[in-house]
Regions:
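Sec-dependent signal peptide recognition
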Residues: 2-10
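N-terminal signal peptide c-region/cleavage motif recognized by signal peptidases
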Residues: 13-16
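Extracytoplasmic copper-binding redox domains, predominantly the cupredoxin/blue-copper superfamily
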Residues: 18-197
Length: 197
């Protein structure tokens, strides 16, 4: 058991043969943590990353939908406004600074997310609106469901397992832990501390 920046990880080999990595993400109290993003980084993974053909984060009911979007580096994201009021979407995050001034409908050009990192979004008109685009430099990423579980399929090798949640303090980087995958099925439990409910 090893604790590193609030990340606790247990790794167990289950059987021989190629199989996926199953992650169980928990909060500090050991409860399943829905909506956590987990991803595996390595030099080899970086060479495999490809932008998505299509991605969008809409605005509906004066909220970003979905509130968290995970995309590989280089992905162009549309921001359709499905409300009857105008929105002014912006980000001042170092990974991507941009502004889509007052609009209804879909802007003519999508926003290309060309650097990895956490991009916090807001609406200059509706201050309560907040969303996140997590830009990853790997094809091996997933978001946990209500049960706190996610499955990653990656070839054997040495990786950095990174975990992020929107409940982490603003500006907090993804937590990370070294991890070696074999050709056996593996299960890991990730415990994230510092996540607000």
């Amino acid at each position: 058991m090893r604790c590193w920046h609030g990340l606790l990880l247990w790794l167990t080999a289950l059987s021989a043969g190629a199989a996926p990595l199953t992650l169980e993400v928990q909060d500090a109290a050991g409860r399943p943590l829905a909506g956590a993003v987990v991803f595996l980084e390595s030099a080899a993974a970086r060479r495999q990353v490809r932008p998505l053909a299509q991605a969008e984060m809409g605005q509906q009911g004066k909220a970003f939908v979905p509130d968290v979007l995970v995309v590989p580096v280089g992905t162009a994201v549309d921001f359709p406004n499905r409300d009857t009021v105008r929105h002014h979407v912006y980000s001042f995050s170092p990974a991507k600074k941009f502004e889509l001034k007052l609009y209804i409908g879909t802007p003519a050009k999508p926003v290309v997310f060309d650097q990895p990192g956490v991009v916090v979004l807001g609406c200059n008109i509706h201050d309560h609106m907040v969303g996140w685009v997590l830009v990853v430099d790997t094809p091996y990423h997933a978001q946990t469901g209500a049960d706190g579980r996610a499955v990653l399929d990656a070839p054997p090798g040495r990786y950095r397992l990174r975990s992020w949640h929107a409940g982490l303090p603003v500006g907090a980087p993804a937590l990370e832990q070294a991890l070696t995958l074999t050709d056996a099925a593996q299960t890991a439990t990730v415990r994230m501390s510092g996540v607000r409910p």
